[in-house]
């Protein structure tokens, strides 16, 4: 959403409204305590996806929710299924399998009801054509098509965040510099490992914006 504000597709006020309602709808989609999220480190995409599909086929849903790197992936789903996935991931050789302190099982199919409610609100917003291309979580490809952007905003609620693919898109664009804006330096750390020839800068505090305001 911040990227869409920067691209002039959404106003700051529209983005605040959408982010607030999106969070509300996601929180209300699954009763508290029935969903869970966990980080799995040390298994490949294929290995972890096989585990999740096997558990889901047994009746309770768990899916890949955030592909941060080749061996650092977040899973999301019902509490029961995520607990089983943590156990099976550990048995399969994961270095770490940690339940995260989040009650909303984001980026999995349990969020489809939230996406339907969000769609109604989003359709009431008159989004503008972006001043520059944006790359979204769902397909990790460049677009300046408003209809596609809207479609992706809806589907990303229940679809995985393809961060590794996004970094690959950055790499193909041969960017000389990537700047992470926001709290923490997690994405900067991941980009430094993946984008060897790109300068990575993190602006995670107010003072850092003042120090580096002329970098762009």
Model-identified regions with their sequence ranges:
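Alpha/beta catalytic cores of group-transfer enzymes, especially the acyltransferase/condensing modules
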Residues: 5-158
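Short helix immediately C-terminal to the catalytic nucleophile in hydrolase catalytic domains
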Residues: 2-6, 188
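Acyltransferase/transacylase module recognition
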Residues: 123-216
